[in-house]
Amino acid sequence: MNTATGFIVLLVLATILGGIEAGESHMRKDAMGRVRRQYCVPVDQPCSLNTQPCCDDATCTQERNENGHTVYYCRA
C-alpha cells in the first residue's frame, strides 16, 4: 500500500469514527435535555422566559424591583 492509499484509508476511517461519535454525543445531549426539562422553577423564585418553566401552574411574570429594574418571578 502506498502513501496516498494509506492516507485515503485513514481519512475514511476518521470520517466514519467522527460520525459515530457525533451521533452518540447527540443522543447524550437529548437525554440531558429531558432531565433538564423535568426541572421547574419554584413559586416566588426568579425565573427567565427562555429557560425552565414554573412549577405548580405558576407563570413567569414581569415585575419591578425596589431599584426600578425589571425582574421576572414565578407567581401562582
Curated annotation (Swiss-Prot):
Domain comment quoted from the record: The presence of a 'disulfide through disulfide knot' structurally defines this protein as a knottin.
Family from the record: Belongs to the neurotoxin 08 (Shiva) family. 02 (omega/kappa toxin) subfamily.
Main subcellular localisation: secreted
One Pfam family here: Omega-toxin
Domain of life: Eukaryota
Name of the featured protein: Omega/Kappa-hexatoxin-Hv1h
UniProt keywords, alphabetically: Cleavage on pair of basic residues, Disulfide bond, Ion channel impairing toxin, Knottin, Secreted, Signal, Toxin
Gene Ontology cellular component annotations, sorted alphabetically: extracellular region
Organism: Hadronyche versuta
Signal peptide coordinates: 1-22
GO molecular function: calcium channel inhibitor activity; toxin activity
Subcellular location as annotated: Secreted
Biological process, per Gene Ontology: defense response
Propeptide: 23-35
Species classification: Eukaryota, Metazoa, Ecdysozoa, Arthropoda, Chelicerata
Tissue specificity comment: Expressed by the venom gland.
Described function: Toxin that may inhibit ion channels.
Cystine bridges: 40-55, 47-60, 54-74
